[in-house]
Curated annotation (Swiss-Prot):
This is Alpha-D-galactose-binding lectin. The record marks M38 as: Removed. The keyword Acetylation applies. N-acetyl-alpha-D-galactosamine 2 binds at E112, H145, G148, D164, K165, H166.
Length: 187
């Protein structure tokens, strides 16, 4: 995507967010206090408050390392989003540069496919970060879920791909400086 297209896309996203906040009674000035663009962020399971981590917490996990939910916060669980095609992009583990993949790298992974980190970059690893509906969607249409679908999964719960939509599969993107402050990841 060219710089001009990316800038236009970012402006459209911000305008959409501003319009949504205005429609529900928030002042536009409050928007700046609530949403910040951030290149590095945490992925927080909305219901439980736990965060997406590479299993074991390594700064350079091996290919096919599972992604789990855990309550700890540290720099080895920071993520970045690299836009590739409009809303689609790679969810990158900031410390290692590896990206989130469905295990096996299938174009249409079945329900319960584990999420892992891997170095390869291809269209089967593209996701969109849906700020409005609080979910992470794979290009094939399935969503990131905690395995088992619990609203309060224990530490070390695997994350998987699944087609269902419900409150237990909602994720938000927050600042590493303030785990309660939402951030915009499309920068």
């Amino acid at each position: 995507m060219t710089f001009a297209k990316q800038s236009c896309f970012n402006s459209i996203i911000l305008l959409s967010i501003a319009t949504s906040y205005f429609k529900i009674g928030h002042k536009i000035s409050e928007l700046g206090n609530r949403i910040e663009k951030m290149t590095t962020f945490l992925i927080k399971h909305k219901a439980s408050g736990k965060f997406l981590h590479p299993k074991g917490g390594s700064s350079n996990p091996a290919n096919d390392t599972n992604l789990v939910l855990h309550s700890d916060i540290h720099e080895r669980m920071y993520f970045q989003f690299d836009v590739v095609d409009e809303r689609w992009g790679y969810i990158k583990h900031a410390a290692s540069g590896k990206i989130v993949h469905p295990l096996g790298g299938k174009a249409d992974p079945p329900n319960e496919t584990k999420l892992v980190l891997h170095q390869d970059r291809h269209d089967r690893a593209l996701f969109a970060m849906d700020f409005f509906n609080d979910n992470i969607i794979h290009k094939a249409g399935k969503y990131v879920h905690p395995k088992g679908g619990s609203t309060n999964p224990p530490n070390e719960t695997l994350t998987v791909m699944h087609g269902d939509k419900h409150g237990a599969m909602e994720f938000i993107f927050v600042s590493p400086k303030n785990k309660d402050k939402r951030v915009l990841v499309y920068v």
